[in-house]
Design a protein with these regions (language model features):
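Phosphodiester-processing cores and adjacent nucleic acid-binding clamps
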Residues: 1-170
């Protein structure tokens, strides 16, 4: 699996760059699927279809992934107090039940401790040529994106213990 992932990422850098960013084509993943696990987040093709109000498209895409990856597909949910998380979780639960796809917990970590949030925001502003004080700058991150302990994650998903169990199993 790891070798396939490195090949896919390398192909993205060599053959798939758009405006200096590597773009990975879906069929490259399908071609190198052996040993690879798929996690559907809100940014995945399935997640985007779910959030844009196209459940039939989401169902169809999920079935395509399941055809190739079988029991190596999961929904990955997070609770970082950001836009659309609750909607995605609701839809992931629906699809998990309908298609027997396990749900795991993740945290989209961007910094080590909660205290590092402001420094992270400063780095983002520098990278985007913005200033922290600008009230109109995008706020794409939250202070919840620090590396949480197992106890913190268990507490965060205490209403969904199966999600924690699935995460540990994975």
């Amino acid at each position: 699996g790891y070798k396939n992932l490195t090949n896919i990422v390398s192909k993205g850098f060599v053959d798939g760059q758009v405006m200096g960013k590597p773009i990975i084509q879906r069929d490259w993943i399908f071609e190198r699927s052996e040993g690879v696990i798929v996690l559907f987040t809100e940014k995945s093709d399935v997640g985007q279809a779910m959030l844009s109000g196209h459940p039939e498209k989401a169902d169809s895409l999920l079935q395509q992934w399941q055809t190739t990856f079988a029991d190596r597909v999961y929904f990955a949910i997070k609770r970082t107090k950001r836009t659309n998380e609750d909607r995605f979780i609701e839809q992931a639960i629906r699809m998990s039940n309908a298609f027997d796809v396990p749900i795991i917990a993740h945290n989209d970590v961007r910094f080590l401790t909660e205290d590092d949030f402001e420094a992270h925001e400063a780095r983002v502003c520098i990278a985007n040529s913005q200033v922290l004080a600008d009230p109109n700058r995008p706020r794409d991150y939250s202070s919840e994106q620090y590396l949480k302990t197992q106890d913190e994650m268990t507490a965060l998903f205490s209403d969904m213990p199966a999600v924690i169990d699935n995460t540990l199993d994975l």
